[in-house]
């Protein structure tokens, strides 16, 4: 069977953009111009404070559902490791810990994802699309009823999405535009049930151990969490034929 591969470090290599830049195209939209008017200076100051150039920007996102926090890590494309540059509180997310396995279950997904698009016309001001379902979801979820359209967006209402507020989505959207404009091909996003310290992971297994599907996923996420905490480099992740992952 085919093994699906997502190699986040490889996709973070430096590359150039054409003169018709991604930023210029995005600035054709009113809400993106509003986001830049209110957040560009903040973004520039934050990156400069961490010695990261917007012209060489690479970002990586981690979400912790229980804590309702999104971390944004950044580096220059020539750097080897990421630095934590911003924590965004999540205003609302529906569901409980555990993976999303079918449509209309109101669950926020968990696992290894990437950003698959930016929407400047969102019903929720601005939105950032998550590539749910990923290869694992397609194998382990309810076939033909997986659901889709999972976004990080404005407002403070969630039906399986990550609602950030309009103010926070403006800033996050600008970071994403800048990363794409600097040549990043894929922005990695890992969604955890919680910050997976040894104690928290043990508690999850104790409280939810009967949910074998979630336990398998959490084991893979725990390995990813520990590796990143140690190296500050997103691990390489292979999606295996049974829907589990090889994390290195």
Feature map (PLM): residue ranges:
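Hydrophobic transmembrane alpha-helices
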Residues: 191-193
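Generic structural signal for short, solvent-exposed loop/turn connectors between secondary structure elements
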Residues: 1-3, 156
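Cell wall/extracellular polymer interaction/catalysis modules
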Residues: 17-159, 167-187, 196-248
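A conserved hydrophobic position in a structured secondary element of the catalytic/binding core
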Residues: 164
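Sec-dependent N-terminal signal peptides
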Residues: 3-13
């Amino acid at each position: 069977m085919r093994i699906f591969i997502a190699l986040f470090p490889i996709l973070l290599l430096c590359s150039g953009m054409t003169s018709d830049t991604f930023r210029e195209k995005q600035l054709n939209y009113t809400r993106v111009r509003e986001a830049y008017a209110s957040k560009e200076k903040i973004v520039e100051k934050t990156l400069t404070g961490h010695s990261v150039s917007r012209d060489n920007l690479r970002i990586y996102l981690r979400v912790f559902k229980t804590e309702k926090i999104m971390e944004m890590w950044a580096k220059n494309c020539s750097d080897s490791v990421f630095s934590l540059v911003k924590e965004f509180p999540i205003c609302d997310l529906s569901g409980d810990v555990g993976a999303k396995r079918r449509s209309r279950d109101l669950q926020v997904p968990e696992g290894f994802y990437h950003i698959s698009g930016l929407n400047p016309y969102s019903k929720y001001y601005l939105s950032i699309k998550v590539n749910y379902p990923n290869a694992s979801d397609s194998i382990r979820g309810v076939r033909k009823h997986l659901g889709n359209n999972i976004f990080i967006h404005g407002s403070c209402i969630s039906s399986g999405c990550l609602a950030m507020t309009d103010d926070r989505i403006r800033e996050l959207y600008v970071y994403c535009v800048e990363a794409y404009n600097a040549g990043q091909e894929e922005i990695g996003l890992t969604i955890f049930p919680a910050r997976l310290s040894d104690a928290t992971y043990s508690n999850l297994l104790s409280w939810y151990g009967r949910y074998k599907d979630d336990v398998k996923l959490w084991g893979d996420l725990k390995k990813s969490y520990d590796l990143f905490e140690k190296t500050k480099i997103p691990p390489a992740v292979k999606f295996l034929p049974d829907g589990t992952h090889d994390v290195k």
